[in-house]
Amino acid sequence: LKIGFIPITCATPLIMAHPLGFYSKQGLNVEVTKTAGWALIRDKMINKEYDATHFLSPMPLAISMGLGSNATPMNVATIQNVNGQAITLALKHKDNRDPKNWKGFKFAIPFEYSMHNFLLRYYLAEAGLNPDTDVQLRVVPPAEMVANLRAGNIDGFLGPDPFNQRAVYEEVGFIHVLTKDLWNGHPCCAFGTSTEFIQKNPNTFAALYRAVLTAAAMARDPKNRELIAKVIAPQAYLNQPEAVLTQ
């Protein structure tokens, strides 16, 4: 089986299930494949290049409805994480913390159909800004957000870890607000597959579900943080220093 993921900590359960042997314990031969961006995840699922994948939680609904792509029925198996995102700003804005003053700012978001887009729009609108006309919202793959912040191409981003912590680690940005302070308990990423895959392979899907759920239960316990950071840090997975992942 081929499972896609974006190299962010939201994908922790489905990534860690690979090195920790949770897939093989269910009798599955799984390849987890790092993917550059969310549009590519969508396209590879529609084209059946992936059997299952890491999704942004709004994506299965958007794909099923044909928003931004041909309509293809998709299902959410599990929500992989809640909260865990942040608005990170360039260091030059450290004294400009009031969003009312952010007219003209350029922000990166990972995808149109994302909680990141919805939460950033909500936050800006609460401050009296029109997200469509007063600021620029640009779709940028999460792995490119810190580089764009450093280059001055954007003023900030609402994105996933490890890239908020990476911006702090590299001293190019600071965390302005955590998304749990905008909506505590909000869903973020999901694990899912096509309706067709579930119907054709119900036992395989059930085994996949059990493997990811087992990993999620382990990831929920803070005492496992260091071990999990160690197994997801390598280049094949998140390609991040363990220090960034444990912060």
Which role fits each region the language model picked out?
Residues 1-139, 145-186:
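Short, glycine-/small- and polar/acidic-enriched structural segments
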Residues 200-247:
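Secondary-structure end/capping motifs
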